[in-house]
Amino acid sequence: MGQGKIEMKRIEDATRRQVTFSKRRAGFLKKANELAVLCDAQVGVVVFSDKGKLFDFCSPPVILMELFHRYEITTRNTRLQETNRDDEQMVMEITRLRNEIDQLEASLRRQTGEDLSSVSTVDELSQLQLQLESSLSKVHARKDELMSQQLEDMRRMHQTVHEQNNFLCRMVTKILLLNVITIMILAAMISITHARIALDDCMQLGYIVIKQENSWRFWFI
């Protein structure tokens, strides 16, 4: 029976982890030696255990420090080549952007009339005139659009203010009408109260009070 697939995760048991490390390390260094012998390659391996113990291998006849030095020089040269290539690309991009900026500035000066010395033919002037007329037409169209929008906003604002004024007028009218009605009711109540008081006084004095049409008549008893 074949060995089952081992799940690639940290071995929690310390003893099993140490045993596995020893076996895998030996096999790994053996494979490195085979690669160096069979392929005539310079191979260097550095391994630190979880306890910090160093294990290394270097294919003869070089020593590990010589191999590290060669690695450092090679990677440094590679980084320098990549840096130089990036610098060249950056210089090319900067040059392209500068040329584009110069062209845009020259075009802007021509369109504003600040520098027409670069325009040497009638056709170029005619083309520039058409561009300016087109730009001016767009400016007028945008101006008309903004003015129409402002007028519409003012109309809506005026309509809103007018509606608010009408509402306030109706509210004020209702309040005034309610005040008048309230005053009339209070006046009527006061008149009735005074009449009742006068009637009571007359009755106490021995008068008979009879209302005839719109007048009051008193008879002494």
Curated annotation (Swiss-Prot):
SUPFAM superfamilies the UniProt entry points to: SRF-like
Gene Ontology MF: a single term: RNA polymerase II cis-regulatory region sequence-specific DNA binding
SMART domains in the cross-refs: MADS
Major localisation: nucleus
Expression sites (tissue/organ): Ubiquitous.
UniProt domain MADS-box: residue ranges: 1-61
Gene Ontology cellular component terms for the protein in this record: nucleus
A single BP term in Gene Ontology: positive regulation of transcription by RNA polymerase II
Entry keyword set: DNA-binding, Nucleus, Transcription, Transcription regulation
Listed PROSITE patterns: K_BOX (PS51297), MADS_BOX_2 (PS50066)
Limits of the K-box domain: 87-178
Localization per record: Nucleus
InterPro entries: MADS-box/MEF2_TF, MEF2-like_N, TF_Kbox, TF_MADSbox, TF_MADSbox_sf
PANTHER family membership: SERUM RESPONSE FACTOR HOMOLOG
Function: Probable transcription factor.
Protein name: MADS-box transcription factor 30
Record organism: Oryza sativa subsp. japonica
